[in-house]
Amino acid sequence: MGRFIFVSFGLLVVFLSLSGTGADCPFDWSSFRQYCYRVFKQLKTWEDAERFCSEQVKGARLVSIESYREAVFVAQLLSENIKATKSHVWIGLSVENKGQQCSSKWSDGSSVSYENLVKPFSKKCFVLKKESEFHKWFNVYCGQQHLFMCKFLRPR
């Protein structure tokens, strides 16, 4: 009887510790609010990283960052997973040229409601840099190869 209680208590502790921290996300993905996130340490161009994300899980795209709190979560997750001192990580932000005007948008189609740009954009794709502790957005050429992070809406 004592062993049953011990095992039951252990399972309860595991269940409670997992709830809200990735329990509803696939293995190796992390949870924040209603989304799942994963850092990939493969070098890819922006376009190849975006395609790779979409092949991992239905609805996955390069990460979009929609608030300061989400930016802090993303920076923390990247810092935990990437130890190299000079790393760049693709995010889903890109610039579209429409004639004389440029507009930025997330690869998942959402509008840019939160910005943390270092300087105005002259190139078309964006990364987070380790040197800024993954807090600032830098624009770089889309054909460069970098690490990347994917995000998708967690199933209910």
Curated annotation (Swiss-Prot):
Keyword Iron-sulfur belongs to the record: no
Gene3D superfamilies: Mannose-Binding Protein A, subunit A
UniProt-recorded Gene Ontology molecular function terms: toxin activity
Residue ranges of every copy of the C-type lectin domain listed in the record: 32-151
InterPro entries in the cross-refs: C-type_lectin-like, C-type_lectin-like/link_sf, C-type_lectin_CS, CTDL_fold, Snaclec
Signal sequence, start to end: 1-23
Cited function: Snaclec that dose-dependently inhibits platelet aggregation induced by ristocetin or low-dose thrombin, but not by high-dose thrombin. Binds to GPIbalpha (GP1BA). In vivo, also dose-dependently induces thrombocytopenia of mice and platelet counts remains at very low level even after 18 hours intravenous injection.
Family statement drawn from the similarity comment of this UniProt entry: Belongs to the snaclec family.
Miscellaneous comment text of the record: Negative results: does not induce platelet aggregation in either platelet rich plasma or washed platelets under high-dose conditions. Does not inhibit platelet aggregation induced by high-dose thrombin. Does not react with polyclonal anti-GPVI and anti-GPIIb antibodies.
Oligomer status and interactors: Heterodimer of subunits alpha and beta; disulfide-linked.
Protein name: Snaclec jerdonibitin subunit alpha
Source species of the chain: Protobothrops jerdonii (Jerdon's pitviper)
